[in-house]
Amino acid sequence: MMREMRVVEKRQLLSAEEIGRTLQRLAHEIVEKSGGTNDLALVGIRRRGVPLSQRLAKTIRDSSGVNVPVGTLDITLYRDDLSTVGPQPVIHSNEIDFSVDDRDLVLVDDVLYTGRTIRAAMNGLFDLGRPKRIRLCVLIDRGHREMPIEASFVGRNVETSDTEIVEVRLKEIDGEERVVLEIGRAHV
């Protein structure tokens, strides 16, 4: 039996300005906890992790003068729910123009939820080589983990229920900038 979700309320969690300030803080944390930018590279998980990783790299460049490599990772083939994605999932290519071997990698995504996306991303990275270290940076951590995965860099922790949805909207993809919590009521 299929459950339908009806949105009862939308509550803004972050405005465009707050997203900008949060990304600045995260960029500084990444550099500080990495002991600088040596061997550092950012890898955005397609879709919304990509513009977030690019913005983090720009902030690092603006503050340190160092161009940190940025890559894009498509995890479609590594998902454990591929059969539920659809009969013909769209596969994009990875765009990682640097060796991941012995790199200090920071995976970047918009929302951390069950951890399954991150597990798939790590599998994809290990197929490309052997990084020195992999850490995770997320804009929102909403809890409800199904995997033993924890973010090293978190923009905001948000307590949610399983019926709520965290929607990240970024200007590069959505034409607007905000993070919203959709509070719904599941019914049959």
Task: Specify the residue positions occupied by each region the protein language model found.
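PRPP-associated nucleotide enzymes
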Residues: 1-186
